[in-house]
């Protein structure tokens, strides 16, 4: 098991593509390789460089060079219409009486940004896969966030998404993890 981390320009993609080269030489087909990165930019760069280096077609040969969110989105058959958008968060805020001007996931790297601290805490707990109230209790709350209000808003957000048939990026990953039929990669 090898995990390669590092800042931009340190050779992560080159190192990984050299490994891909070895796997291809060992007879592993490109579609049996899962190449996942944190950002869309990095995934696109890796796919482009792999296609050039190995004479492959990005669409047909390298469908699994992508971000985890993109992979889950694709495997679950999701559409953009089924994803929470800023307008949905604003509607949720109006229904609950909390101000929300900004709330969205980056399509580049899946990070969540909101001007509402309650939503930020709910999202961060989900990303860390921590119980919401345990996460709340573990942090030094500088901003006045009420524990009970946080819990109720999190429950209401779940209900809102369910009623509307919407998901956020965290839901995608959670749903994917419970999915029975995963691709069986020879190399991940």
Label for each model-derived stretch:
Residues 1-10, 14-15, 32-34, 104-188:
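Accessory N-terminal region flanking or inserted into the helicase ATPase core
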């Amino acid at each position: 098991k090898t995990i390669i981390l590092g800042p931009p320009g340190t050779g992560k993609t080159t190192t990984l593509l050299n490994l891909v080269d070895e796997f291809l030489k060992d007879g592993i087909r490109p579609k049996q390789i899962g190449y996942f990165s944190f950002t869309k930019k990095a995934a696109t760069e890796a796919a482009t460089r792999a296609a050039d280096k190995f004479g492959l077609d990005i669409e047909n040969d390298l469908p699994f060079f992508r971000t985890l969110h993109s992979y889950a989105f694709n495997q679950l058959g999701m559409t953009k219409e089924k994803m929470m958008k800023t307008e949905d968060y604003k509607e949720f805020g109006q229904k609950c009486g909390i101000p929300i001007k900004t709330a969205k996931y980056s399509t580049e790297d899946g990070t969540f940004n909101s001007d509402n601290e309650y939503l930020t805490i709910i999202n961060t707990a989900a990303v860390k896969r921590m119980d919401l109230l345990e996460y709340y209790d573990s942090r030094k709350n500088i901003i006045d966030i009420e524990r009970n209000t946080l819990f109720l808003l999190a429950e209401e957000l779940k209900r809102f998404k369910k009623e509307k048939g919407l998901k956020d990026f965290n839901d995608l990953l959670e749903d994917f993890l419970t999915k029975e039929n995963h691709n069986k990669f020879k190399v991940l």
